Amino acid sequence: MPLIVASLQAELVGIFDKPKGNPVPTPVMIDVAKAYLNFCSAGIDSGGSPFAAMPGSSALGQDLDAVMSKTNASGAIAAMDMAKAFDKCLATFKTAWQTTIVTAPGLPVLGSELVDLFSSPKPSAIIFAQGYAKALNNYTATAIVSGLIPGSPPVPYTGPIS
């Protein structure tokens, strides 16, 4: 099953679109981490190997909460710290036949998109959540997974998560 940005958007809209807002960051950031795990768990690598685990997702909620709980001089600093937290998490993405994952190419893109997202208030939580999901999808799609399809001899592959 491929990565479906609409499913991530729907989960994030459910998290952020509350009648009274979200005054406490901890449960919100934990839910964002769960939504990202759910999104990534639909991914397969270019060798056809399905998602197996992403152990970094358990720390992602805490890392995002730490970013949102501290006082930052600007939204740009918080956005870059969040991008690093997502990068740390995605670096633990595993599929059944994977040998390595490279997430570095997408980090500047994610940082830039999150800086844009956090640089000014959005007219609604829905627009914010959709932009957040789009940024995470664009970032995740740039990760490159390499692995070996079992066989004699094994067949190497390299490509993006889809």
Language model feature labels by segment:
Residues 1-162:
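Extracellular "spike/adhesin" assembly and maturation modules
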